[in-house]
Amino acid sequence: MGVFQKLFGRNTDAFYAPMAGKAVAITEVPDPTFAEGMLGNGIAIEPVEGKVYAPCDASVDMMFPTGHAVSLISDTGAEILIHVGLETVSLEGKPFKIYAVNGDRVKKCQLLIDVDLEAIKAAGLSTITPMVICNTGAYSTFHTVVGRNVTNEDVVIELAE
């Protein structure tokens, strides 16, 4: 049972960490597109391993051909964007191996992308990985868990309508 459901008895949606690492506030992402919430509210992960997992049961709306980002639609309608690293589109897909394609149904904690974090670092790019809920405005309550180490088995975002 989530924090909001315990407190208010409301239905909530829970989203799990897409990667293992330290969960940080979206405002700490060194890219204004994410830090200023232009794409929605969320969290970011400073990853310690190169595996990207589905944060919930969802459909793959768009797996970018380069593998640097994936857009999902949760079974409850949340629009989720996971962007692996910053400016990583410039790597033309080299450090990424994709395990899902557009239209696929995925389950919570299902592997979506393998990424070579060392290759991203060697290119001088950040590995910080934002996960944002693009339709944040559809929810009355938005709770994030940041400032601690997480795995794909930890809830990092809870939403209530």
Give the ranges of each region predicted by the language model.
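Contiguous, well-folded functional domains in the mature portion of proteins
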Residues: M1-E161
